[in-house]
């Protein structure tokens, strides 16, 4: 059976055979090589030129040439042998410690002792200049120092934010309770957990109201911040005793206009039984005042028990000498059970601190 010859084995006549005598190999003799990704073709490298400064030729010195060292000074000449002696005497010392010891010893030498080493250093300098007339000092490039790790500034920002927030709270607190001319923080009279809010009041100092405000039912806070706490409690006493001496219409006006200090220690207008006396509640906000405005007298009076306050608010009808208004009864501090609220304990302490309430008549 005859097989046809494959096409790649045939010799096709080319038109350049008669013109050019160059022999062209047949197509089947040239092996077809496909480029593999593992062996990429090497790029053509430029041929090095004998002229310096071109291509890959070194421009300063040949790699094989040794580096020319600087001539030694007088200290180096003296320390060359002295370092060996110290290293033999103290083999456990570090090289840096030896260098410090050598430097201190060189400073302690006199000029006469340094003279031979200075002369030897000058001789070496002249010899070095003769051996290398074209020598130029080229310091080695220093190694790049390791970059210092950047400290995360988030704790600092948090601390600064906390400090700024504390200062903002202080400024808000200063706006709510202006001082009587003192700018120190001590004059705020802020109670600590170890003291009661009533401890900042001096019992010997009497309460004072202007003459034009004695006849009014609601005297304004005519005191500094330290007396603002007491005035808030006096306000509570007057509000409790109002049903016996004033009409409900006046009472509604009192309940709708609480003082800022009373709101500071009791922002919700109720009994602060859940908050210790030594701790301060957050500063008052506008929503608390608006919520207090919407409450009626009946809702507020529902939280009070008149029978409980009658045993603490027995005020005398007699007037003290020198005071044009009734004076509260001076009595010994009473022991209050633990089950009662902290508001009752605060009012019992207030009754012993010479608070004067002109509105209470019975």
Swiss-Prot record:
Which positions form S-S bridges?
none
Q: Name one Pfam family in it.
A: HMG_box
Give me the stretches of Basic and acidic residues compositional bias. 1-13, 59-68
Q: Which CDD domains match?
A: HMG-box_SoxF_SOX18 (cd22048)
In the record, biological process GO terms are: heart development; negative regulation of Wnt signaling pathway
Its keywords, alphabetically, are: Developmental protein, DNA-binding, Nucleus, Transcription, Transcription regulation
Q: Which residues form the Sox C-terminal domain?
A: 235-361
Q: Which GO terms describe its molecular function?
A: sequence-specific DNA binding
**Residue numbers covered by motif 9aaTAD:** 307-315
DNA bind region = 68-136
Q: Which cellular component appears as one GO term in the record?
A: nucleus
List, alphabetically, the PROSITE patterns matched: HMG_BOX_2 (PS50118), SOX_C (PS51516)
User: What does this protein do, in the record's words?
Assistant: Transcription factor. Binds to the consensus DNA sequence 5'-AACAAT-3'. Also binds 5'-CACAAT-3' and 5'-AATAAT-3' but with a lower affinity. Acts partially redundantly with sox7 during cardiogenesis, acting indirectly through nodal-signaling to induce mesodermal, organizer and endodermal tissues, which then interact to initiate cardiogenesis. Also acts as an antagonist of beta-catenin signaling.
Q: What is known of its domains?
A: Binds target DNA via the HMG box domain. The 9aaTAD motif is a transactivation domain present in a large number of yeast and animal transcription factors.
Q: What is this protein called?
A: Transcription factor Sox-18
Please tell me the species this chain comes from: Xenopus tropicalis (Western clawed frog)
What lineage, starting at the top, does this entry show? Eukaryota, Metazoa, Chordata, Craniata, Vertebrata
